[in-house]
Amino acid sequence: MSMTAHGADSGMSARVRRKVAVAVLATACLVLAVAQFGSSAGAATASKTTVVLGATATTPDPSCPSLPCQAVGSVTGYQVSNDQAQLPFRVSRKGKVKSWTLTLAQPTNSQRSFFNGFFGTPPQARLSILLRVAGTNPPRYNLRSQGSIHVLSPYLGQTVRFGASLKVEPGDIVGITVPTWAPAFAEGLGAKNVWRASREPGSCTNSTDVRQGEPHMRVGTRGTYGCKYSTARLLYTVTVVED
């Protein structure tokens, strides 16, 4: 009786061991599949490239509070070239703008009062996604999208970073729009530093024209960027995560 009972126990133990082995093998396969999926997903994430448009080895100091103190106002603009690149804000691959920076001067109280009176208050800026209209000269750009307006008063004297979520396509230009004024401007630089503004040709230097200028802020419309300024730079950068 005991021997028969022992033989039955042995057979049952063997069957249990086989089931346990199968269960362990299935679990191992599941873990391996999850690990491989996680590795694949991680590789896809790691393959995305982050590009900082407009970045240079050094950033020039903004013009204020030194004299002459200059700021940009009532305009949409973009950098045509800087010391290191042509069209430094042109997008080369599909992706998304994730953040952008402005290097802001700290104007004196009297300088701030002047700009507030001339352009309006408070100092503000936003990003603009532009696409050139083929065959136009002076160039015209379609405003494809734009970011939120940021008030700059709390950040004067700093380099500030703002978050963003703007889709971009190859060929887009990421510009900056200033509804009032922004002391994110350096002048007296080398001849390679050139930027364009959303003003009509012939309305580039007269103070009345500049004051009455209108930034390009209606999405889906076209604007003329007929004014080109040399030896100066708009002090912004844009971080794009490419798809």
Segments from the language model and where they lie:
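Secretory targeting and sorting signals
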Residues: 4-9, 15-44
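A broad structural signal for short, well-ordered beta-strand segments within beta-sheet-rich domains
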Residues: 97-99, 143-146, 236
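Activation corresponds to long, low-complexity, non-globular regions
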Residues: 46-53, 209-243
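Aromatic- and Gly/Pro-enriched, solvent-exposed loop/edge beta-strand patches characteristic
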Residues: 45-69, 119-211
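Short beta-strands within extracellular/lumenal beta-sheet-rich domains
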Residues: 72-92, 158-160
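A short beta-strand element within beta-rich, extracytoplasmic domains
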Residues: 93-120
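Extracytoplasmic low-complexity repetitive segments enriched in small/polar residues
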Residues: 81-84, 101-103, 118, 129, ...
